[in-house]
A protein has these predicted regions:
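Alpha-helical transmembrane segments
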Residues: 2-44, 83-112, 144-185, 208, ...
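Membrane-interface helix-loop junction between the first two transmembrane segments
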Residues: 43-61
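Short, aromatic-rich amphipathic segments at membrane interfaces
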Residues: 190-212
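Juxtamembrane helix-capping/reentrant segments at transmembrane boundaries
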Residues: 59-73, 127-138
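Membrane interface segments of multi-pass transport proteins and intramembrane proteases
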Residues: 18, 121-131
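Non-transmembrane, extramembrane segments of multi-pass ion/lipid transporters
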Residues: 55-65, 263-268
Length: 423
């Protein structure tokens, strides 16, 4: 809202009003504002939750070999994250921007879904929370809405790469002069960096474009659901999900800025996406909220984000990647989320297969994979066999595991950005 106010005042040459037209100014201001809101509101939210005695009452001692006391810590801290994102975004962003609208809707939608899950766990004393099928329906629904909006909205357009020329020993990429609806997406490790969904559906003949858009919508649903669940699984140690997500947010912010700038888009040979600079503002709010939340969520945590936070965080990451046509980079950028999800799938499916044979065989000590690194041999199920029982040879403290996962995510983020120049 303030953006429109100061743009109006700029007509009357009010000193400083022109600064609001610069994306860098608004983005940095949003980051600072979000961080301060998160720090200020977080402290008060924690005190209020403790007064109301709203906290997790049941913790699994089998995955806490170091005896760190976790009972009595308030949860549903995702409320702090959501407020810290939305307030500065609404104040400082261009709220009529289609991409910003999609991000706000995603935040509210998945925030509400996660809130329902936490509410059932805490107030209904049901540790299972919202049934898995309802979570999936909620995630699929927002993925469908985002995919359909990007397909049908006249404002969601790109300017595709058109020509490649050599000038003074440098590659110069020219973009189409007209913005178009595009099914192209950036793909790493190939020469032209682009994959067209319609080309995959070329067997559909004259219907290949429509089929390509259907494939795009399906891909959007899969991305949003997968990343949202991956972030949810990653939220198992103090500061783990918030720290990893902050790093991912920085990488996505860089990708969004490059995609919104025709010069940088040409240099890196990727699609130029007009008006996507508002995603930079949103992602700066996201980063600020993560850092501010870490102030209280770092070990030993004073508050947990709960599903209110983790489902929302994953959805934000997935939708943002789809909007800037970088969803195929997520297996690298969100590698930690991917491994967390894969470990759970491997563990559950392998156990089911072996159980049919009358055996109780597990692959890992515990899943998600971060729990595998802190579980003692003495805490393992004596009736089960473990394929990787000796890995690791000793458990680690959760703060060490968290920091190592952060470092891994930083490396993966760097690799993701490097892929833009690898061709």
């Amino acid at each position: 809202m303030l953006y429109y106010l100061f743009r109006f005042l700029d007509q009357y040459d009010i000193p400083g009003s022109h600064m609001w037209s610069y994306i860098s100014f608004r983005a940095l201001l949003t980051l600072i504002f979000s961080l301060l809101i998160s720090a200020w509101f977080g402290e008060r939210f924690i005190k209020w939750m403790k007064r109301k005695k709203i906290f997790e009452t049941e913790r699994d001692p089998s995955i806490d070999p170091f005896g760190v006391e976790k009972k009595g810590v308030p949860t549903m801290g995702g409320v702090v994250i959501i407020v810290s994102i939305l307030v500065p975004v609404i104040l400082l962003g261009r709220v009529r921007n289609i991409y910003l609208i999609l991000m706000v809707v995603t935040t509210l939608w998945l925030g509400f879904l996660g809130f329902l899950d936490d509410y059932i766990k805490i107030f209904k004393r049901n540790k299972e929370g919202l049934k898995g099928k309802y979570k999936i329906v909620g995630q699929v629904s927002i993925g469908f809405i985002v995919g359909l909006t990007l397909w049908l909205s006249p404002d969601a357009v790109v300017r595709e790469n058109m020509d490649v020329k050599m000038q003074n020993q440098e590659i110069v990429i020219k973009h189409k002069s007209e913005a178009v609806k595009s099914l192209q997406t950036t793909i790493p490790f190939i020469k032209n960096h682009n994959l067209n969904y319609s080309s995959i559906m070329s067997f559909c003949g004259k219907y290949k474009v429509a089929a390509g858009w259907m494939l795009f919508v399906i891909m959007t649903i899969l991305v949003v659901t997968a990343v949202s669940n991956g972030a949810n699984l990653n939220d198992g140690m103090d500061g783990m999900c918030a720290g990893n997500s902050a790093v991912i947010g920085v990488a996505l912010g860089i990708l969004a800025y490059v995609s919104s700038h025709i010069g940088y888009a040409s240099y890196f040979d990727i699609m130029y996406i007009p008006h996507s600079e508002e995603l930079v503002v949103f992602l700066c709010a996201f980063i600020g909220a993560m850092i501010g939340f870490l102030w209280y969520n770092a070990f030993p945590a004073q508050i947990f984000m709960g599903d209110t936070g983790s489902l929302t965080i994953g959805g934000i990451i997935g939708v943002c990647a789809v909007i800037i046509h970088k969803e195929l980079l997520l297996p690298i950028l969100c590698g930690i989320f991917f491994v967390e999800s894969l470990s759970v799938i491997i563990q559950t499916q392998w156990f089911k297969i072996q159980k049919r044979k009358g055996k109780r065989v597990r692959v890992f000590r515990a899943t998600p994979i971060h729990d595998n690194f802190r579980k003692l041999d003495s805490q393992l199920d004596a009736t089960s066999q473990y394929i990787l029982k000796g890995w690791p040879h000793r458990p680690f403290h959760e703060s060490k595991i968290t920091i190592r996962f952060w470092i891994t995510t930083i490396i993966l983020a760097a690799i993701t950005l490097i892929t833009l120049k690898m061709r």
